[in-house]
């Protein structure tokens, strides 16, 4: 999702709507928790995280029920391959407005059936928080959803106790400012009421640092999986949040011209090539690095090459999956591209009558891609 509610512009201090995928200027003062909560659709309270976006995402049970009901109605998103059976080890799912992306969410999230889900999200505003080269966790005990609160799994504290202190920070304001995980949690909770989560958002970092952090988090996650006698897919899964290309002048990304049919076709084909290329088949370090280097300048990771907002969440999440499975003595995870859509490829879900809407324009000069990938434990 690329523009939140009007209140978010308070961070920018200039009154200008900023696309989330666009490069954001550095901010001298880190937003306070109080400032961030003023931008939330439903502010966090006490030990429970609230909701950043109450326009593009469901905030009431009847809204979530309607989205769920309608998201399986035709026309369906473009099919890239056969979906594996439910019980997958991980997925990549978009996080744009339900009105645009709901049908793509529905193609991939029901494949996740585990009770415990490690959520790997985008940190869109990492520059404003001065965050880089660390993993960002929260301290909340639960997250609010339309269907009821979701507890944070106890393994979060167990894992953080084992990680080097320099590998992570805990920042509730950062998580309150971010929408990329809440969008997915609401679907997961709707499908499984006993869901528990471990949320983490990933700011900018180089690939070498990413490998270090993923390796150490994988090691402690594998310890917890072993201690609890869990199985990947059955009991625990990794869910990665990311939209695909953000095309248009607002995103500072117009390699095929300002927009129009030809630019749209070329941008979508570029997305498909990534989904069928480094995101497909056995997960290897070389393929993960290929994706990383396609999206960012490896020498200056904050510089976009291709505007996938999950330029850090996807490679980190894939490395986490691969290294956790290796630590458990399991086969290499296999990527299965399932579906692809964009903010203009399908009709809107008819949910405006229950209070859902859009947070940004969607047209041939301003569009966002939606990837759907599942990961299974290979044979």
Model-based region annotation:
Residues 323-379:
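Long, Lys/Arg- and hydrophobic-enriched amphipathic alpha-helices
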Residues 11-13, 88, 333:
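Intrinsically disordered, low-complexity segments enriched in small/polar residues
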Residues 9-11, 228-230, 363-365:
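Generic marker of residues within folded, mature protein domains
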Residues 5-16:
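Bacterial N-terminal signal peptides
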Residues 1-2:
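N-terminal secretory signal peptides that target proteins for export/translocation
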Residues 17-21:
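Boundary at the C-terminal end of the N-terminal hydrophobic targeting segment
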């Amino acid at each position: 999702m690329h523009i939140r509610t009007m209140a978010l512009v308070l961070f920018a201090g200039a009154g200008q709507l900023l696309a989330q995928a666009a490069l954001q200027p550095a901010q001298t003062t880190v937003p306070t928790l109080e400032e961030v909560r003023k931008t939330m659709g439903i502010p966090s309270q006490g030990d429970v995280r609230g909701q950043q976006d109450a326009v593009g995402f469901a905030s009431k049970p009847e809204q979530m029920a309607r989205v769920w009901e309608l998201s399986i109605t035709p026309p369906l998103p473009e099919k890239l391959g056969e979906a594996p059976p439910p019980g997958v080890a991980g997925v990549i799912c978009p996080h744009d407005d339900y009105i645009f992306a709901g049908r793509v969410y529905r193609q991939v999230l029901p494949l996740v059936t585990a009770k415990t889900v490690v959520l790997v999200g985008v940190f869109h505003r990492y520059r404003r928080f001065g965050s880089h080269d660390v993993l960002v966790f929260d301290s909340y005990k639960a997250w609010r959803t339309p269907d009821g609160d979701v507890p944070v799994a106890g393994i979060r504290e167990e894992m953080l106790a084992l990680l080097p202190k320099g590998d992570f920070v805990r920042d509730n304001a950062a998580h309150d400012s971010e929408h990329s995980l809440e969008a997915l949690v609401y679907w997961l909770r709707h499908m499984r009421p006993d869901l528990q989560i471990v949320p983490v958002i990933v700011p900018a970092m180089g690939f070498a640092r990413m490998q270090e952090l993923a390796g150490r988090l994988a090691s402690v996650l594998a310890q917890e999986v072993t201690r609890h006698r869990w199985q990947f897919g059955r009991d625990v899964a990794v869910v990665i949040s990311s939209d695909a290309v953000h095309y248009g002048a607002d995103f500072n990304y117009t390699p095929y011209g300002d927009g129009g049919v030809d630019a749209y076709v070329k941008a979508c084909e570029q997305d498909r090539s990534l989904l069928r290329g480094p995101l497909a088949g056995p997960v290897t370090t070389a393929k993960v690095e290929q994706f990383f280097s396609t999206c960012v300048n490896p020498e200056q990771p904050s510089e976009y090459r291709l505007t996938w907002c999950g330029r850090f969440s996807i490679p980190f999440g894939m490395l986490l999956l691969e290294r956790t499975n290796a630590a458990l003595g399991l086969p290499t995870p296999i990527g299965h591209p399932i579906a692809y859509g964009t903010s203009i490829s399908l009709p809107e879900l008819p949910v405006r009558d229950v209070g859902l809407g859009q947070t940004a324009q969607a047209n041939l000069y301003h569009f966002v891609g939606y990837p759907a990938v599942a990961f299974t434990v290979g044979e």
